[in-house]
Amino acid sequence: MASSATDRIVIISDPHLLSPELVVPGTAIERADAVETKMMAHSDDIMHALTDSIIALQPACVLISGDLTHNGERLSHERMVQYLDRMARYGIQPLVIPGNHDCNNPSARRFDGDKTLPAATVTREEFAQLYSRYGYGEGFRRDPSSLSYCCEPVEGVVIIGIDSNMDELNTLTSRGDSTDTYHNGGCIKPETLQWVTRIASEANADGKRVIAMMHHHLAQHFDQEDRLFANYIVKDHNNVAQQLMQAGVHTIFTGHLHVTDAATLYNSDRTDSIVDVGTGSAICYPFAMRVAQLNDESNSLEVSTRWLTEAPECPDLREQGRQRIIAATPGLTTLLSSKVWNKVGPRMGQIKKFLEAGGNKTNLPETSQQASQLVFRHLSGVLSRTMLAVVEGNEQDLQTEDLINEGKLGIRAMIEEAAPEQADALWEFFLNDVYPKLEPVVRSILEDRNAVATDKETRADDLHLSCKL
């Protein structure tokens, strides 16, 4: 079929917009920006460039799957609405859904020279009012239990925005609570899931196609995501996915993890499936957006990926963003090391005693920080390249075996530093007992495989997809 703008949809996620009104240049914003993979200080500039790109594409609608703002600041929401209004003036229908950063956020801040100060956030009711034209006002069907809604921006195509956030559990001292607490995990309320499946079933019964979006992942984008990064995938995700499939939802756009990745989840007998199309953060390298074209002949959605390459005040946007990812390696190392240390650390005394039996000497780490430094010394290079591969998508196009072998060499060097006199025996133990458990996860990440080495294994093309409707 000949494509047209009337059946084109653009998808972006996690723009994390920080209003310029919240920033007075100085050391406060510089310090905050320096530790981010997100290009926070350039978020307004990037959103300006994205808006120009979207207007040039002239899609029927734009889906934004959450984390519209940096930390839920009211002024940032108001700034985002200005950009959406500009798109709307060109006949484009923006549609939004909140992310975990967007409502009831105790971390809302403004940056004033060398000071970081509290800023006003928004309630869920205020969010709905601000975005009344983009999901929550007249002409939209609302779920009474959440910020979920549905609409039909293209004739015969129903969009369902699903609220997967838990910010109703947040507490804010600015509102009289005793402490500030914040929840970034995902959960769909039972009554909301019931509402969503009813809407989807009705749409399918009427011969309409259904596309969903929400902030958190629905499918695991790598093996054991629900264990290693549980806050990035909705609770009870398999059951939720099965119910959505049964209701006729086969494509859902998500965000949250800031990676451009796709994963397919099947029902038990592989007769039905749902594709979770994750889109990376609009203000993180490689600055991805999705362009989806409806195909009536195949009843599918043809999804391609594009990248923003520059912004008015940041002509070297991609290189700056790439360096941010590399600079984040120490933080990733600390995160991974702490997860391992939480399990191994309490037994380190016993391990040390066992390895030093017979007079052997060891240099075992005694703290989580020392463990992190050990990992960083030997694995920083391979971790940086792996992070770049993951955020860029289509990791299988890279030299996976080279990365895996480099990682093994780094682990061997770690063992030799920590326990030089026992290195051969420990290396043998790693190869025979530890690595077989790690390998499915490693290959799942680096080869875009899910359910590795099982009868449900799938492999995705992260950047170019044909999604059935």
Where are these regions (language model features)?
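Extended active-site neighborhood of metal-dependent phosphoesterases/phosphodiesterases
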Residues: R79-S201, R270, V291, L301
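N-terminal active-site segment of His-dependent metallophosphoesterases
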Residues: M1-H77
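Active-site-proximal beta-strand elements of phosphoester/diester hydrolases
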Residues: T6-P20, A32, G156-L172, M213, ...
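Divalent metal-coordination and catalytic microenvironments
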Residues: D14, V62, D67, M80, ...
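Active-site environment of divalent metal-dependent phosphoester hydrolases
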Residues: L18-E21, H70-G72, N100-A108, D167-N170, ...
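Non-catalytic terminal accessory segments
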Residues: M1-D7, P315-L469
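Acidic/histidine-rich helix-loop elements
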Residues: H16-I46, G72, G113, E168-I188, ...
